[in-house]
Amino acid sequence: LRQQLSISVSLGRRVHIMRWDKGLAAFQTEDILAKYPDVSDGTHPLIRKAAGLWGRRALARWLTETTNPTDMIVGEVPIIGNRFSEFIQAQPDQVEPALASEETTFIYPVPTKSLRANLEAIRRSTFANPKHPDEARDAPPSTMELAWRLTCAKAAELGLISEADSHSPYEEMIYVRFFEHLLQHRNAIRIGVDTIYSNAGSAHDLGANVLELNASPDEVRCVIAEVEAAFTVEEATRDVENWYRV
């Protein structure tokens, strides 16, 4: 992601970014968390739902307000577990044509087995000893493990892999099949990754020339209220549990 940003800036593009962790953080206020505390698999479903709704609307607003052809927007969209998975779902709103357009590309990296193991080790290290303020808010290593278990379970449920494979350790084939399903409504490119650039610094160091989209307190209040009016907690939970059905 950082390399993409760096290259884009060097080519004269004005880059904006929307990241799940930063977008979600705006919704994790003391008052909201008191009402909707974390659950066993992470952030409360209603908060995830609200953050995703804000994300699509923020993108729609950016597209409307941005007229300079040198501007571009990059999204960090984890998807697994309903983390900005709204961006891959075909929805009847004003931003869907742009998301489905050939001008929008969803890039998903596929690490090799050995690289995946190294990434897990790096996450354990940065989580235990954060060297950047945002690393302290990174998901714990157990979230990476949960994401893989979810990938296998949902891939098996969809018939993409066998039941026996659903208990497999990380396997590139499973990862690719699942993401091909998730991104079937999007212009998607797979990139195989087998190298870690050890001197690349923190993944959160984006550079001074990158502008980040964040939800304002008023936006947070409005979106939370809208989701509360439209869904009970049980309904929001069921909706979030179906994040992989696109």
List each model region and its residues:
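Glycine-rich phosphate-binding P-loop
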Residues: 1-7
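A generic structural signal for well-ordered alpha-helical segments
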Residues: 8-10, 99
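Conserved nucleotide-sensing/catalytic segment adjacent to the nucleotide-binding pocket
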Residues: 10-86
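Well-ordered, non-membrane alpha-helical segments in soluble/globular domains
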Residues: 45-60, 86-95, 134-145, 175-176
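Noncatalytic linker/hinge segments flanking ATPase motor cores
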Residues: 57-61, 111-123, 145-155
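ATP-dependent NMP and nucleoside kinases share a basic, alpha-helical "lid"
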Residues: 77-140
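A conserved mid-domain beta-alpha-beta active-site/ligand-binding segment of alpha/beta enzyme cores
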Residues: 127-202
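C-terminal accessory extensions appended to soluble enzyme cores
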Residues: 169, 174-246
